[in-house]
Amino acid sequence: MSETVQIKAPWLASKDPEVPSTLNYSTLSMCGRVEEMVRQYPNYTAYEFMGKTTTYAEMWQKINACAKSLKAIGIREGDKVTICMPNAPQTLCMFYAVNMVGAIANM
C-alpha cells in the first residue's frame, strides 16, 4: 500500500498567492526538452552571443554534430565527461551533446 507523506513547508504561508505551490515538470530528458523546443520553435532564437543569434534548429544541428563526434571518439552511455570551457555557445552544445549520448556531464 502506498502512503502519502506530507512535508512541512512553512515558507508557503508567506509566498505570493499568484505563485503556484508546486510545478509540473516535464518527464522528458534535458535533450528531449530541447528537441521539443526545436520542433515547436525551430526559427526562434535559442541564444545570442557576441551579436550573433542562433536559432533552435541551428543549435540542434550543432548539438547533433558534437554528439556524433563524441561517439566517434568512443564516448558512450554512462561515461563521465568533464567540460572545462568558457561560458560560450560551444559549452552549451557540448553539455547537451554529452547528455544526448547518455554520458554524464561534469562541469
Question: Positions of the model-derived regions?
Answer:
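Flexible, non-catalytic linker and terminal segments flanking ANL/adenylate-forming cores
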Residues: 1-27
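Conserved AMP-binding/adenylate-forming core of the ANL superfamily
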Residues: 26, 35, 43-96
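Conserved donor sugar-nucleotide recognition element shared by glycan-biosynthetic enzymes
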Residues: 30
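Anion (oxyanion) recognition and catalysis
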Residues: 99
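Structured binding elements
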Residues: 102
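Short catalytic-loop micro-motif centered on adjacent basic/acidic residues
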Residues: 105-107
